[in-house]
From Swiss-Prot:
Cited PANTHER family: F-ACTIN-CAPPING PROTEIN SUBUNIT BETA (PTHR10619:SF1)
Pfam families: F_actin_cap_B
Name of the protein in its database record: F-actin-capping protein subunit beta
Positions carrying Phosphoserine: S31
GO cellular component: brush border; cortical cytoskeleton; cytoskeletal calyx; F-actin capping protein complex; hippocampal mossy fiber to CA3 synapse; lamellipodium; membrane; postsynaptic density
Record keywords, A-Z: Acetylation, Actin capping, Actin-binding, Cytoplasm, Cytoskeleton, Phosphoprotein
Domain of life (superkingdom): Eukaryota
Chloroplast as UniProt keyword: no
Length: 301
């Protein structure tokens, strides 16, 4: 692991702000171009190898360390809360130094006395959100692990909803779904409405290894954003509003992955490999052409 990874004080998804830097012209342009190329490369590499590829890129260009770590989402890792005996997910949003906070017990592991904590009001909301998304995960994914972390902002709060579902390798199929939903909530002065900004990233990979078709890897990541104003009331609290946004976003991303990415891959594979013999395929094409010609003649009459 690269030495700079443990020293970063900011989350992986936050944006770095450059203050008081001099304009070095060509050097700055070259650095920006290197970062663009590195990010473009990471988008095209398998999600299950993100950590290794990210480490290799940082070793090649150490000056991009902070920019890459703040821009590239990494697969979620699972830890066990020894206090309550439940699993939770690790990310930079529940990390303080080398310790990670569990959403279930609100304790850091390894123990940390002065670790960052949400306010009492937000902690209560965090507990309710974890219970709600635990049920959501069980209904939609039938397993896996989920975690929700919230933190205070000046005019509202922000949070991250994490969901991870890994395949068990049965039927010679391996895979993993990692979704990271970062939401920012700006509460209006009236207290009756709020502005929600959601940024969602899904990393998905599948690997099959069957004697009939051989080994096939398929994976990628997709990021989408949306903003929406919602009414806040007893009938429609923050958790319900955020839950609907996350549910709609995951359905859209899942549909996009299924129809575009997997559908396109299926078309490509079917174009390269066919279960039909060439003779049968030629007969089918000839029959289709005959039907088209017959319909044209019928329309002309």
């Amino acid at each position: 692991m690269h030495p700079c990874r443990r020293s970063l004080p900011f989350p992986l998804n936050c944006q770095l702000v450059k203050v008081g830097t001099a304009d070095y012209g060509g050097a700055s342009d070259q650095s920006d171009q290197q970062l663009d190329c590195a990010l473009d490369l990471m988008r095209r590499l398998p999600p299950q190898q993100i950590e290794k590829n990210l480490s290799d890129l940082i070793d090649l260009v150490p000056s991009l360390c902070e920019d890459l770590l703040s821009s590239v989402d990494q697969p979620l890792k699972i830890a066990r809360d020894k206090v309550v005996g439940k699993d939770y997910l690790l990310c930079d949003y529940n990390r303080d130094g080398d310790s990670y906070r569990s959403p279930w017990s609100n304790k850091y592991d390894p123990p940390l006395e002065d670790g960052a904590m949400p306010s009492a009001r937000l902690r209560k909301l965090e507990v309710e959100a974890n219970n709600a998304f635990d049920q959501y995960r069980d209904l939609y994914f039938e397993g896996g692990v989920s975690s929700v972390y919230l933190w205070d902002l000046d005019h509202g709060f922000a949070g991250v909803i994490l969901i991870k579902k890994a395949g068990d390798g049965s039927k010679k199929i391996k895979g993993c779904w990692d979704s990271i939903h970062v939401v920012e909530v700006q509460e209006k002065s009236s207290g009756r409405t709020a502005h929600y900004k959601l940024t969602s990233t899904v990393m998905l990979w599948l690997q099959t290894n069957k004697s009939g078709s051989g080994t096939m890897n398929l994976g990628g990541s997709l990021t989408r954003q949306m903003e929406k104003d919602e009414t806040v009331s007893d009938c429609s609290p923050h958790i319900a509003n955020i839950g609907r946004l996350v549910e709609d976003m995951e359905n859209k991303i899942r549909s996009t992955l299924n129809e575009i990415y997997f559908g396109k891959t299926k078309d490509i594979v079917n174009g390269l490999r066919s279960v039909q013999t060439f003779a049968d395929k030629s007969k089918q094409e000839a029959l289709k052409n005959d039907l088209v010609e017959a319909l044209k003649r019928k329309q002309q009459c």
